[in-house]
């Protein structure tokens, strides 16, 4: 789980620096519409992988979805900590 926090910091830096030849920077340059398109695509791929009962494919696709959700959170100025706090409120 610690890696997700590290990834959040990496994504924030990519958004700030917008390096050339960076897929993540390209997402940020494309704005929220491009990011949302990728989130939607990845969510669909998760559904298909789960429907196919393919654990390896599902692991890969969930990782892609989590990555793109984190990009969306950074774009929207939200942190993983805020999401964790919301989940904690709901389930404690």
Swiss-Prot record:
Organism superkingdom: Bacteria
Where is this protein localized, as stated in its record? Cytoplasm
- Similarity comment: Belongs to the PRA-PH family.
Q: Which GO terms describe its biological process?
A: L-histidine biosynthetic process
Could you tell me which Gene3D superfamilies the record lists for this protein?
MazG-like
Name the Pfam families for this protein: PRA-PH
Its recorded reaction(s) are: 1-(5-phospho-beta-D-ribosyl)-ATP + H2O = 1-(5-phospho-beta-D-ribosyl)-5'-AMP + diphosphate + H(+)
> What pathway or pathways are given for this protein in its record?
Amino-acid biosynthesis; L-histidine biosynthesis; L-histidine from 5-phospho-alpha-D-ribose 1-diphosphate: step 2/9
Stored SUPFAM superfamilies: all-alpha NTP pyrophosphatases
Q: Name the Gene Ontology molecular function terms of this record.
A: ATP binding; phosphoribosyl-ATP diphosphatase activity
The UniProt record lists the keyword Ion transport: no
Q: Which GO terms describe its cellular component?
A: cytoplasm
EC nos: 3.6.1.31
User: Which keywords accompany this UniProt record?
Assistant: Amino-acid biosynthesis, ATP-binding, Cytoplasm, Histidine biosynthesis, Hydrolase, Nucleotide-binding
- Just give the chief location class: cytoplasm
The answer to keyword Nucleotide-binding applying to this record is yes
- Protein name in UniProt: Phosphoribosyl-ATP pyrophosphatase
